[in-house]
């Protein structure tokens, strides 16, 4: 990715931004997530957003583009409500190489992200508390440890059953 230190200097915000060059332990990360008003991800090709999920596990709403695994986090598939602000995709590119033939990159606009931040900070204390409770419930029921274990187990059972039902013996003949 880009050199964030250089970016902060170019923007003139280097005195208000802190970068860590060391690994931050879980207890400190938990504190940071808990004191955050929201978590923003501007990823354009996210398989699954771990930082956004960690944030949600503390009840912190997220702002994220509707791309990849972030869509499942920011949009509650049960009722299509949002766990923060879901950013629409404003530009889509198709990238390819020898190792990865084709992959879409979905970009949300900076203007939409700015509006989302304004929306989050415009919520009343009661609205923030209600959203935080919703985010926390969704994160724990959909992505909590027991649910993950259950889904993993069910997937393995399905794979084994499908393999047994669809197994065909192949005879290889020499030509």
Regions found by a protein language model. Name each.
Residues 1-23:
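Nucleotide-activated donor-binding/catalytic signature segment of Leloir-type glycosyltransferases, i.e.
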Residues 49-52, 70:
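Short glycine/serine-rich donor-binding loops of glycosyltransferases
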Residues 145-175:
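C-terminal alpha-helical cap of glycosyltransferases
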Residues 44:
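Aromatic "clamp/platform" in nucleotide-sugar-dependent glycosyltransferases that forms part
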């Amino acid at each position: 990715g880009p050199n964030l230190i250089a970016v902060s200097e170019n923007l003139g915000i280097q005195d208000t931004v802190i970068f860590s060059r060391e690994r931050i332990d879980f207890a400190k990360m938990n504190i940071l997530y808990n004191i955050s008003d929201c978590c923003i991800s501007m990823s354009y090709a996210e398989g699954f957003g771990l930082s956004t999920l960690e944030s949600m596990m503390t009840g912190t709403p997220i702002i994220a583009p509707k791309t990849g695994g972030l869509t499942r986090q920011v949009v509650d598939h049960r009722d299509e409500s949002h766990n923060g602000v879901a950013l629409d995709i404003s530009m889509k590119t198709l990238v390819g190489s020898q190792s990865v033939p084709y992959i879409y990159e979905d970009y949300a606009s900076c203007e939409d992200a700015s509006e989302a931040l304004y929306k989050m900070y415009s919520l009343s204390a009661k609205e923030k508390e209600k959203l935080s409770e919703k985010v926390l419930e969704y994160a724990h029921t959909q992505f909590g440890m027991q649910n993950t274990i259950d889904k993993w187990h069910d997937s393995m059972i399905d794979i084994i059953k499908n393999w047994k039902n669809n197994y065909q013996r192949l005879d290889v003949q020499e030509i």
